């Protein structure tokens, strides 16, 4: 199975301006993400950016980078531009790896690509991980997903879904027998679907939840979800996240790449 990786890397960030260029043990964050993506076995890794500084940084390391429009509403829209400009065939599998996840497990990238390859009925694939603690379920910054019996996403939400009414009413923890899944923000698509996605009308529900993948479900497409044993890596959204990731890379450089 062959697949490509596209890393959307916007310069603007409300909390950490220029986030893709922040230093992590001597390399820009986006370069760390590229290295993890290459370790997944991807046939091609492309950074899609909207800023010349990111373009210059990636090029200086000899990696593939493409300037894209600054007007895209989401990373998926940015990736769709790459697919169109590169002329990739409709059946090409493209994995969206977030540019702020320098600790992402390369095996997870391959797992999600493989999941989509194995499910011809799905237009997209993503991943989830079982949650074991009530605070995480109640945390709106942790997105939850509910699956059908074929492993397709029924819905994504920042709310606790499914809601264990009786257990929570009795101040109990998560009841056994009904796993609650944390969505992991990695996506695989077929290039042909990305061309169609760019023309899909945004849905009110995606704005309400601030979750772009809901547009796909709203329009009736299927998303196959890989249940992984690999806990999601720490992304970088705050100064505290950045400090943690730096400490992990510095202390375990040989393990990380």
UniProtKB/Swiss-Prot annotation:
Membrane spanning stretches: none
Enzyme class: transferase
Transferase found in the keyword field: yes
UniProt GO MF annotations: 3-deoxy-manno-octulosonate cytidylyltransferase activity
GO terms classed as biological process: CMP-keto-3-deoxy-D-manno-octulosonic acid biosynthetic process; lipopolysaccharide biosynthetic process
UniProt KW keywords: Cytoplasm, Lipopolysaccharide biosynthesis, Nucleotidyltransferase, Transferase
This protein's pathway: Nucleotide-sugar biosynthesis; CMP-3-deoxy-D-manno-octulosonate biosynthesis; CMP-3-deoxy-D-manno-octulosonate from 3-deoxy-D-manno-octulosonate and CTP: step 1/1; Bacterial outer membrane biogenesis; lipopolysaccharide biosynthesis
GO cellular component: cytosol
Pfam family, any one: CTP_transf_3
Catalytic activity: 3-deoxy-alpha-D-manno-oct-2-ulosonate + CTP = CMP-3-deoxy-beta-D-manno-octulosonate + diphosphate
Catalytic activity, EC: 2.7.7.38
NAD found in the keyword field: no
Annotated compartments: Cytoplasm
Function in brief: Activates KDO (a required 8-carbon sugar) for incorporation into bacterial lipopolysaccharide in Gram-negative bacteria.
Entries under NCBIfam families matching the protein: kdsB, PRK05450.1-3, PRK05450.1-5, PRK13368.1
Name of the protein: 3-deoxy-manno-octulosonate cytidylyltransferase
Organism: Methylobacillus flagellatus (strain ATCC 51484 / DSM 6875 / VKM B-1610 / KT)
Recorded name of the encoding gene: kdsB
